[in-house]
């Protein structure tokens, strides 16, 4: 995330939380083999997440890509296409964008973990 995007992300998340409410922020971690510029952007992203969570007194949960893919598609090294196909099949959707599929997969990963805790 470029430096200028962090305030925009903060504003969007703050507005969504104020409008719809939340108890937990859930996001996907990155793999360790990423390029330095990606790691820098990710660090800014996590900083925004932590600040928003602190301001709104929210819990934070983070899941690795392989875990999310395993929950979504049944295998930890699923391709983007496999995740999209699995999300559409499991939930009767017609998602075509991999970012949307990832968001749905992250949500369901969290919900599965939450159900296991109860």
Residue ranges and their predicted role:
Residues 1-118:
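Phosphate- and other anionic-substrate recognition elements at nucleic-acid/protein interfaces
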């Amino acid at each position: 995330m470029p430096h200028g995007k962090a305030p925009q992300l903060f504003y969007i998340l703050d507005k969504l939380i104020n409008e719809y409410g939340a108890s937990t922020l859930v996001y996907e971690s990155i793999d360790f083999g990423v390029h330095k510029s990606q790691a820098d952007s990710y660090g800014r992203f996590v900083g925004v997440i932590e600040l928003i969570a602190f301001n709104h007194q929210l819990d934070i949960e983070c899941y690795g890509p392989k875990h999310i893919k395993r929950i979504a598609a049944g295998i930890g090294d699923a391709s983007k296409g496999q995740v999209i196909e699995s999300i559409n099949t499991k939930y009767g959707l017609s998602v075509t964008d991999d970012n949307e599929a990832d968001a749905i997969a992250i949500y369901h990963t969290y919900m599965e973990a939450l159900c296991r805790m109860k």
